[in-house]
């Protein structure tokens, strides 16, 4: 009597950033067992409801998918896999990933800007800008953000995201085609 094991359990989201998920994203667990198993029972995000389990090429390869909805809480995607081999031997329930893969974090919270400041390098005052001056907009968000689209004086600005992705800076150099402005 040999108990089955799960040699591979990985997780990913169909989000652009596969370690993140928001409402509407599909989270997929990939499961590879040591031998053929019956259809495993998989709970994700606190329930088996809404989880679709599909056999792959054979009964040792499985995927389990679930779509994130507004009712799911933010946080790391918890899961539980129970399974048995074809002979009925139960394997130990699995609740963690193999191989150090990234977990999927559900994040449905809209980021907000907590601080924003704008200044120029004008020698008469950082609130003024004339052609040739550089205007810098610094933004601090409440969580990591992707590169925002920023316009300064109605023109596209160059954006720099810092290593702590909650902080970014946007820079624009006033051209001679623009009037003096107060920023």
Residue spans for each PLM region:
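Extracellular beta-sheet repeat scaffolds used for adhesion and glycan interaction
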Residues: 14-18, 23-25, 39-80, 84-87, ...
